[in-house]
């Protein structure tokens, strides 16, 4: 199970997975979050370019959510206005924590991460059409020592029971 389609693509290119077992198991949404003091002050993405608001994003080179956020801001035509306001973080958890603590006004995380907000709130959910699909692929590794058990586990991950659990944690 990978949080990165690109990483799974690399495994497939290197012929390290059983290609017939590969599938996109989960999906996620990208959301704009705000710290509690922003409630009532910001209610849409356009305000990011006009207001004096800092934005926490994951590093573009290493954090998929950061890359997706840039795609959204490019698609909405606001990247040039918001780029100078961005404070980059090492991962999505760091983005969530710095916004939830009130150190930075807004940030972009996955909807599954936003469920962990204690003080902050979700300002907006970005359209899936504004960024590459956020999918979590799964596949059996070719040199798996216990393929039968691994296949049963993959089957379980696709079951209704597992899907309901994933939904509780913000995945689709």
Locate predicted features.
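Exported/periplasmic ABC-transporter solute-binding proteins
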Residues: 2-27, 31-172
